[in-house]
Curated annotation (Swiss-Prot):
Zn(2+) 3 binds at residues 181, 226, 228. PANTHER family: APURINIC-APYRIMIDINIC ENDONUCLEASE, ENDONUCLEASE IV ENDODEOXYRIBONUCLEASE IV. This is Probable endonuclease 4. InterPro entries: AP_endonuc_2, AP_endonuc_F2_Zn_BS, Xyl_isomerase-like_sf, Xyl_isomerase-like_TIM-brl. It comes from the Bacteria. It comes from Staphylococcus aureus (strain JH9). Coiled coil: none annotated. One of its GO terms (molecular function) is deoxyribonuclease IV (phage-T4-induced) activity. Its EC number is 3.1.21.2. Binds 3 Zn(2+) ions. Gene3D superfamilies: Divalent-metal-dependent TIM barrel enzymes (3.20.20.150). Zn(2+) 2 binds at residues 144, 178, 213, 258.
Length: 296
């Protein structure tokens, strides 16, 4: 089963360190940002330590790396040309890094229309993606299902479908299905996941889903908040998320946890991924998980 989490990529070890961290959590796949998600400071491809990273991955049976684009990219922005241009240029560079790392998909938040309206935002995203997807490599951009916070685009399957339909080289577009976001956007992920998936299939096609973000939600369905919770401790609940992780439709695609670190003290928070992954492998909820994470 391809199950992993977001892991860090930093220091001198870079990808090697990411692979070691994923192995220590008992993962078979993992997701990285190529640098801090809040800025555009990046190391050169030569400094990402890719060869050693791949050696560690081979040794420990890790595969299907996923890259996540930084949050600062907003190609839906119609009011500031510099924001749009930065997004297009930086996304092209990120795709080059993604290809060098050996990942097939880079996850992208479609963007926010910042008041110009959904139609204008979608048209701008299409314009940006058409600019980005001209070069000849095989990296896909995985558009993420969004919660609908603020002026986010991608809160409905229809919005994502409109983007995909407008892009010329749309064979290089995939979808990252985020359980928390989709729940927060109003879909009944908790009680009728197959119904949600059928709806997605009719509007977009389930074969477009190439990454799943597995997150519980701190808020009730339709809250449009996007606040992740640990597996089984939120409004979606363990049973629904366990069902999704083991779903036949997602058997061969990476399922990535982005759940929050545990702990009240901001200086002493601990990653939950090792124990959450064990729990999902055993298919048994552990109400003591958070306490056990702090005792690690």
């Amino acid at each position: 089963m391809l199950l992993g989490s977001h892991v860090s990529m930093s220091g001198k070890k870079m990808l090697e360190g990411s692979a070691i961290e994923a192995y220590e959590y008992g993962e078979t796949t993992f997701m990285i940002y190529t640098g801090a998600p809040q800025n555009t400071r990046r190391k050169s491809i030569e400094d990402l330590n890719i060869t050693k990273g791949h050696e560690v991955m081979e040794k420990y049976g890790l595969s299907n790396i996923v890259v996540h684009a930084p949050y600062i990219i907003n190609i839906a922005n119609t009011t500031k040309p510099e924001t749009f241009n930065l997004g297009v240029d930086f996304l092209q560079q990120e795709i080059e890094r993604t290809q060098a790392i050996g990942a097939k998909d880079i996850v992208l938040h479609p963007g926010a229309h910042v008041g110009a309206g959904v139609d204008a935002g979608i048209n701008k995203i299409i314009e940006g993606l058409n600019e980005v997807l001209t070069n000849d490599n095989n990296v896909r951009i995985a558009l993420e299902t969004m919660a609908g916070k603020g002026t986010e685009i991608g809160r409905s399957f229809e919005e994502l479908a409109r983007i995909i339909d407008g892009v010329h080289n749309n064979e290089r577009l995939s979808v990252c299905f985020d359980t928390c976001h989709t729940h927060d956007a109003g879909y009944n992920v908790k009680e009728d996941f197959d119904g949600v998936l059928n709806e997605f299939d009719k509007i977009i096609g389930v074969d477009r889903i190439k990454v799943v973000h597995v997150n519980d939600s701190k808020n009730d369905r339709g809250a449009q908040k996007d606040r992740h919770e640990n597996i089984g401790f939120g409004y979606i609940g363990f049973d629904a998320l366990n069902y999704i992780v083991h779903h036949d439709s997602f058997k061969d695609i990476p399922k990535i946890l982005e759940t929050p670190y545990v702990g009240e003290d901001k200086k002493n928070k601990k990653p939950p991924y090792k124990l959450e992954i064990e729990m999902l492998k055993q298919q048994q909820f552990d109400p003591e998980l958070k306490n056990k994470v702090m005792q690690q």
